[in-house]
Amino acid sequence: HLLGQKFSPTPEQAAVISSSPGPLLVVAGAGAGKTETMAARVVWLVANGYVTPDHVLGLTFTRKAAQQLGQRIRQRLQRLADNPDFDGPDAQRIRQAIYTSDVDTSTYDSYAGTILRSYGLLLPVETTATIVDAAELSEEATHLVAQWSEVFAVERASTSVVSDLLSLRAEMSNHMVDSSTVREENQRLCEELIGLPKAPRARSEFTKEMQDFLNVCHYRDQLLDLIDQFDARMRDMGYLDFGQQMAYAAGLACTHPQVGES
């Protein structure tokens, strides 16, 4: 009513908008009105005095979506502040907060970059690193694999090795683990496989299937060696990719209280 909206929110949207402050997971598909619901949620929190606009952070996957979300929130807050029917004991304070502060909307990658530029030296990570895209990563990985002199434990084309290298490296960033951690787990798996009881009449130490598993373990170790070389080369060139940037930013927020507080 105070926003002059043409359509009222659905019961499901209203439940999200007016839910108690705190963590909330909402699952919604395309066309469900996510942007409008998020904007209304922010207005509800501000109007009820739970937050001021400058304590609101909205993160999305694309720049366009971030711009749309920010614009939508600002428009709705402006309507609320300009409406003379918005009154109450804290209305003037809330209205002043809307006029003098602003929400922050950004993409996940951009926000991670902001954290890294501000606090990267705590890791330490070079705060002026150049962000490279998938094509540049693939090119660097291709050069590295071409220079690899060791025979791979599994039969793979060089393009497949490049793909495997980048895929494993991305998964490591997503799970915030380093090569030593993965190598330890891989070694543990190999030892468990080797320690499995053998068939009573087995003609060889390992069956073909078991040998295939062990070859994959060895291949994974080789990929980890490549990843270590790849990351060293990236550091020397002052490069970071989006996955690393996100992992470093998350690590900063988790391990340094001043980052989370800011």
Language model features: what each stretch is:
Residues 60, 81-207, 221-228, 237-240:
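Conserved ATP-dependent motor core of P-loop NTPases, especially the RecA-like helicase ATPase domain
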Residues 1-124, 261:
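P-loop NTPase Walker
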Residues 1-27, 32, 36-37, 55-57, ...:
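Accessory N-terminal region flanking or inserted into the helicase ATPase core
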Residues 44, 75, 79, 143-150, ...:
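A generic structural signal for well-ordered alpha-helical segments enriched in polar/charged residues
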